[in-house]
Amino acid sequence: MIYQSPTIQVELLEDNIARLCFNAAGSVNKLDRETIDSLNAALDAIKQDTNIQGLVLTSGKGAFIVGADITEFLGLFAQEESVLLPWIAEANVVFNKIEDLPFPTISAINGFALGGGFETVLATDFRIADTTAKLGLPETKLGLIPGFGGTVRLPRLIGADNALEWITTGKDHKPEAALKVGAIDAVVAPENLEASAIAMLKEALSEKLDWQARRAKKQAPLNLPKLEAMMSFATAKGMVFKVAGKHYPAPMTAISVIEQAARSERADALMVEHQAFIKLAKTDVAQALIGIFLNDQLVKGKAKKAGKLAKNVDSAAVLGAGIMGGGIAYQSASKGTPIVMKDIAQPALDLGLGEASKLLAAQIKRGRSTPEKMAKVLNNITATLDYAPVKDVDVVVEAVVEHPKVKSMVLAEVEQNVSDDAIITSNTSTISINLLAKSLKKPERFCGMHFFNPVHKMPLVEVIRGENSSEETIASVVAYASKMGKTPIVVNDCPGFFVNRVLFPYFAGFSGLLADGADFAAIDKVMEKQFGWPMGPAYLLDVVGIDTGHHAQAVMAEGFPDRMGKDGKDAIDIMFDSERFGQKNNKGFYAYSVDRRGKPKKDLDPTSYELLGAEFGDLKAFESDEIIARTMIPMIIETVRCLEEGIIATPAEADMGLVFGLGFPPFRGGVFRYIDTMGVANFVALADKYAHLGGLYQVTDAMRELAANNGSYYQA
């Protein structure tokens, strides 16, 4: 053994070839500080052993290296730039050591080699991957750029255009695609990986492969004529800005870094990368996106833990077909859980099956599925008008019309037609789970399972715990949601649960602005372009359905009369009373027509302005800051109330719920990350400025206390 640590082992094989094996104690290899330090020491030991003539990097895990240890990032990035720059420079010395060894090197890549893992293999002269490999640089998804030489080595290896696409999109790539552009040198079967790597290394040792020329190319300026470079980088900037926009600076920074370093050799090129990496690491966007990644890991960890308490869900049923039922059936069946879709009307079943077929056909059109897979998924969906096929299922999802009496009747009926240990859930968006549980003999085997529309696109599922729901019930539904490919968060029962409860104060803030004469289109523009929502409040109401919003608003007003009760008509009432229900009947705040692609196209409609003007008077202009404050403060305070009341367990789960359930701008990280970034005291001061507008704008005592103590919701 040449070197051994808890994360790395180095031993000498035949023919004086050394094998460096990444093999950490956990389930995966990560490039944490300990591993980088071990790699540094291992390379020193390798360099000192004069017998070694070649080096192969391998992994003792099912994945090569999944990337850097992101759990270290937030604490690390909180330090000053003067501390971070030497840190990243020192880390890069380690990768340079790989590249500077006096003999040829190769990486044998299995499974994931992402981020720092991929940058590690870029430092070797050759790369060979097995058929399970996934390679890529996903740092831009975290608001960063590669920091261990990725922006320097990859363009010199695969060309500027290919490298720009790899780095700015942050996508991972299959080995065949990586081979095509030259990121790796061969693809082999997993059982042949190490032997093939050693064989290639021997070809380099016998000078059949010119490893020194390979190495020199990676360390030299980019081989790109000046005019071609100008065109490449200008085109890339235009295309990337169109996708990334002004709120996500990392992809544009990556282009600038590659462009600036194009004429430089390794040392100067790496310095350009270091400085840009550190600047991005200090941005609020990076903090927010890293926070989302960590929150996602926390939620997934909770779901995994729940799986240990859960009963097996091998079959399911959805009651109520149509678009929602069809979407739930598609999601369950496509992820491997057979599902019965029951309705009382054949046309509804046809609609549900049609929805599933449409979604599957779209997958085939995009090249993500095949007709054979489509047939298999459809065979996993059993459409029925009676309860016979439902009797042995493990979980039932009730998804009938949003009416308490109808739901209660259907729930009581299905309980008579399933096994004693079946779990029953309701896909209600507003009706109390405790109220619905009264219709059941076994309320302990009942909870809410709130999907968001469209089911196949929206990642969130709210699992709503009623006062009688058992831990096994909750755990089983969480596990089933995870199995469906969804992100489940557990919330306690209250009007609107979590997501709708915090959404409607936002709509109330919007309605208040309209009552004071604001233009709904101007509000939408500010909330989309400046704050970053995918849709402004008027457009969102049109898409959700103003009739749906009107009903939910009434539920919220009844549940929280002090804060959400209304004195008179608001904008939602006006639209509803005029039967302007949004996209569903082509008129809401906006008018809708169908474009050439068959998609709804929105236009301003004078009728909307006439209706609102008759109630609220002439339009007035509002500053962007006031529009943002008056819409967002109520949502933020209500979110904090949900945490304080125990409706949601942690800031992390709240923020994931908002990002995945409502489309809260990811670059802001969620409500709690947003407050922490602003500073709790600054937020309290801003809310106090608008406190005269009513209870929705009045912060809680606990918030004031946190502000006074200079506290935050997330701990660094």
From Swiss-Prot:
Pathway(s) the chain acts in: Lipid metabolism; fatty acid beta-oxidation
Binding-site list for substrate: D296, N500
GO biological process: fatty acid beta-oxidation
Catalytic activity: a (3S)-3-hydroxyacyl-CoA + NAD(+) = a 3-oxoacyl-CoA + NADH + H(+); a (3S)-3-hydroxyacyl-CoA = a (2E)-enoyl-CoA + H2O; a 4-saturated-(3S)-3-hydroxyacyl-CoA = a (3E)-enoyl-CoA + H2O; (3S)-3-hydroxybutanoyl-CoA = (3R)-3-hydroxybutanoyl-CoA
Any one GO cellular component localisation term in the record: fatty acid beta-oxidation multienzyme complex
Entry keyword set: Fatty acid metabolism, Isomerase, Lipid degradation, Lipid metabolism, Lyase, Multifunctional enzyme, NAD, Oxidoreductase
Active-site residues (renumbered): H450 (for 3-hydroxyacyl-coa dehydrogenase activity)
Top-level taxon: Bacteria
Region (Enoyl-CoA hydratase/isomerase): 1-189
Chain residue ranges for the region called 3-hydroxyacyl-CoA dehydrogenase: 311-716
Protein name: Fatty acid oxidation complex subunit alpha
